[in-house]
């Protein structure tokens, strides 16, 4: 009986010693891990959410502006901890400039890259007030960033040009933008009608500490001549352009990708998508200069 008791006590003591030994090892391991974590610094920028923004820039022959836009925009978004891609949609064909179709192409590229929201951002318009929001706007919300009270030039009530943000899902719901606008102007006004018809929530940035003179910087040079559309002497264009387009949009934009390339501007990498658009001369004969 005494021998059995001694064996039981010995076993208990051994188990206790083993438990103490593993406890000491665990404490030491935690201390080492804590020291390693203290010395480790994550080199990646802090992300406020899992959302990813694609900055879509419709573009042609604006290299001087692009050199300034790219590093400025990248720094601005990094300061807001916004995960992003900058996509320059470069029109390479000889047709008149078609901003809306290029943005439709940009949506396809943004979807391919896994972005869940997008901002249409003209290359000559730079946000300078850090309060200007580029974070995720939410489903069903369209955020006009260059609202009339802050845009350097345009202040009319229905203006939604310059910089406009929404989710990729909502852009698809709107069927994107009309493809009939060749030349400069009016595509935003038609897109405004699409938004109103859709019942999506159009919001405008407000409550900033700045005004139209110092919220954005407009770097469009006076030597940059705009190809206004419609031509003033073409009554047919006026009739076509002023009507709501229920036919064309994201689903039927026709184009050919010539190439994709990465360009570096002062340490900022942007993706250039070289695009040749297609024009239906029977529908929009004014696509040629």
Curated annotation (Swiss-Prot):
Subcellular location: Membrane
Positions of Mn(2+) binding: 124, 218
Documented effect of changing residue 183 to E: In n2841; F1 adults accumulate eggs in the uterus. Embryos are arrested at the 1-cell embryonic stage. Partial collapse of vulva invagination
The keyword ATP-binding is annotated on this UniProt entry: no
Organism: Caenorhabditis elegans
Record-listed N-acetyl-D-glucosamine binding positions: 186-189
Protein name: Xylosylprotein 4-beta-galactosyltransferase
Gene3D superfamilies linked: Spore Coat Polysaccharide Biosynthesis Protein SpsA, Chain A (3.90.550.10)
Cellular component per GO, a single term: Golgi apparatus
Family classification: Belongs to the glycosyltransferase 7 family.
Tagged with keyword Manganese: yes
This protein's UniProt keywords: Glycoprotein, Glycosyltransferase, Magnesium, Manganese, Membrane, Metal-binding, Signal-anchor, Transferase, Transmembrane, Transmembrane helix
Cytoplasmic topological intervals: 1-6
Chief place where the protein resides: membrane
Transmembrane segments: 7-27
Glycosylated residue positions: 81, 90, 201
Cofactor(s) listed: Mn(2+)
Biased composition (Basic residues): 217-226
